[in-house]
């Protein structure tokens, strides 16, 4: 009757030859866990301290590998979640718009109000200071009718503000964001200009 030959799961040698594999400690651990009778035959009934320590280390290593694998999966999941959130934020930004409005004030003076910038994580107060310095005029941040922050600039600087906001958004990679320009009251001709224009037309008709 043929006797079944056992081969070590670590070095693939028969257990009797594991000492020549250079992996004896791990081989003994494997054998103690998979064939206690053969282990007892080769090494005695008691598992020596060295084998027990090796078994503990291997166990810890397995736990460490499992933990590392779990951490890696969690990290990938968090990265995917972060990417999805960033994509949603970008879509929100691209679908938003910045409103630049020119309004007439008394004595033929104008103000320019800018709203909608908070979506793009722009520091409104800092930008207001930049405008105040750039245009040498009064500039402040206040709440509009929709209870949202808007920058109010004293002066007729609509075109300059539009160009500046365009370049500011382009720097943030948002050149496709819509700018809505509202001119609530076009600049009117001075009465003297209108009178002169009418006189010229009358003279030409003579």
Swiss-Prot record:
InterPro entries noted in UniProt: DENR/SUI1_TIF, DENR_C, DENR_eukaryotes, DENR_N, SUI1, SUI1_dom_sf
Disulfide cysteine pairs (residue numbers): none
Record comment regarding domains: The SUI1 domain may be involved in RNA binding.
Any one biological process term the GO annotation gives: nuclear-transcribed mRNA catabolic process, nonsense-mediated decay
UniProt-recorded name of the protein: Translation machinery-associated protein 22
Gene Ontology cellular component annotations, sorted alphabetically: cytoplasm; ribonucleoprotein complex; ribosome
Any Pfam family matching the protein: SUI1
Domain SUI1 intervals: 98-169
Gene: TMA22
Region: Disordered, residue numbers: 184-206
Organism: Vanderwaltozyma polyspora (strain ATCC 22028 / DSM 70294 / BCRC 21397 / CBS 2163 / NBRC 10782 / NRRL Y-8283 / UCD 57-17) (Kluyveromyces polysporus)
Description of how the protein assembles with itself and partners: Interacts with the 40S ribosomal subunit.
Similarity field: Belongs to the DENR family.
Keyword Ribosomal protein among record annotations: yes
Keywords associated with the record: Cytoplasm, Ribonucleoprotein, Ribosomal protein
Location(s) in or outside the cell: Cytoplasm
Any GO molecular function: mRNA binding
Compositional bias segments (type: Low complexity): 196-206
């Amino acid at each position: 009757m043929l006797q079944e030959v056992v081969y070590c799961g670590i070095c693939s040698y028969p257990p009797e030859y594991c000492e020549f594999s250079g992996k004896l400690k791990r081989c003994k651990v494997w054998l103690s866990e998979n064939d206690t009778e053969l282990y007892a035959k080769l090494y005695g009934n008691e598992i020596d301290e060295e084998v027990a320590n090796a078994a503990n280390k291997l166990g810890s290593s397995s736990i460490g590998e499992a933990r590392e694998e779990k951490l890696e999966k969690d990290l990938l999941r968090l990265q995917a979640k972060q990417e999805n959130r960033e994509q949603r934020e970008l879509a929100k930004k691209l679908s938003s718009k910045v409103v630049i409005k020119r309004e007439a004030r008394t004595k033929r003076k104008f103000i320019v109000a800018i709203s909608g910038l908070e979506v793009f994580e722009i520091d409104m107060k800092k930008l207001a200071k930049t405008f105040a310095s750039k245009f040498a005029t009064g500039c402040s941040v206040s709440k509009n009718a929709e209870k949202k922050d808007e920058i109010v600039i004293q002066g007729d600087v609509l075109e300059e503000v539009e160009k500046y906001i365009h370049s500011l958004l382009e720097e943030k990679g948002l050149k496709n964001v819509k700018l809505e320009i509202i001119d609530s009251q076009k600049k009117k001709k001075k009465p003297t200009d209108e009178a002169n224009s009418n006189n010229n037309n009358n003279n030409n008709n003579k």
